[in-house]
Swiss-Prot record:
Biological process according to GO: translation
Keywords: Ribonucleoprotein, Ribosomal protein
Ribonucleoprotein as UniProt keyword: yes
Family from the record: Belongs to the universal ribosomal protein uS2 family.
PROSITE patterns in UniProt: RIBOSOMAL_S2_1
Record bears the keyword Transferase: no
Record's protein name: Small ribosomal subunit protein uS2
One GO MF term attached to the UniProt entry: structural constituent of ribosome
Length: 250
């Protein structure tokens, strides 16, 4: 579903941070200020959001993966829910250093998590109460840290981040590996190095929901379009195999 200017206004996307905390590199996206609060220019934010969503859709259409990241309190639940709805990996609790740059090691942890789940389903009766407690603690920690990426077998094709200041390590890792970045950037942070900037409030829960929902919708749409294209191609190929023969009466 396309995001509208009205929705952005109602979600408070235009409210930036206090003017004394601003980052001058965000000046092109600032409309002005009111009561010492910077006001973000939604006439610039909206098309940039649409461009970011279009990119996410294109990645999904070519069967790529968009990793959704939002570990700050007001983003956690929303990011997890929207990522699950879109069927993509996510990080909603904390970013582990090396999650991308040391993905080989992370995959070992993912295997451990999956093995433990299988073991749990089979039953833990063979373990002592102390061992069961230690098992439960390790499983809970792995689930919390990497549960959202347990089905991510390769590095993502793009990363969507809410609040660049809060996720500096994730952004640095993505840049190092050349993974395209889609990110919400508020007035107190620099947009440098972000491939698809969404200038906007990164603290409002309503705004966070709008961003995450918009990107998730784009991912779902892209995947749907890809399926439609495959179906059309199959139908066209099948049609070519049959040649109509007009019989003339003898």
């Amino acid at each position: 579903m396309a995001i509208t200017m009205r929705e952005m206004l109602e979600a408070g996307v235009h409210f930036g941070h206090q003017t004394r905390f601003w980052n001058p590199k965000m000046a092109p996206f600032i409309f002005g200020h009111r009561n010492k609060i910077h006001i973000i220019n939604l006439e610039k934010s909206l098309p940039m959001f649409q461009e970011a969503a279009k990119f996410a859709s294109q990645v999904s259409a070519r069967r790529g993966t968009v990793l959704m990241v939002g570990t700050k309190r007001q983003a956690r639940e929303t990011v997890a829910l929207e990522a699950q709805r879109a069927g993509v990996p996510y990080v909603d609790q904390r970013w582990l250093g090396g999650m991308l740059t040391n993905f080989k090691t992370v995959k070992t942890s993912i295997k451990r998590l999956k093995d433990m789940k299988i073991q749990q389903e089979a039953g833990l009766d063979s373990l002592s109460k102390k061992e069961q407690l230690m098992f439960a603690r390790e499983l809970a920690k792995l689930e919390r840290d990497i549960g959202g990426i347990q089905d991510m077998t390769v590095l993502p094709d793009a990363i969507f981040v809410i609040d660049v200041g809060f996720h500096k390590i994730a952004i640095a890792e993505a840049k190092k590996l050349g993974i395209p970045l889609i990110a919400v950037v508020d007035t107190n942070h620099s947009p440098e190095g972000i491939d698809y900037i969404i200038p906007g409030n990164d603290d409002s829960s309503k705004a966070v929901i709008l961003y995450a929902r918009g990107i998730a919708d784009a991912i779902i749409e892209g995947r749907s379009n890809a399926v439609d294209d495959v179906v059309k191609a199959v139908v066209a190929e099948s049609s070519d195999e049959f040649v109509e023969v007009n019989e003339t009466a003898a």
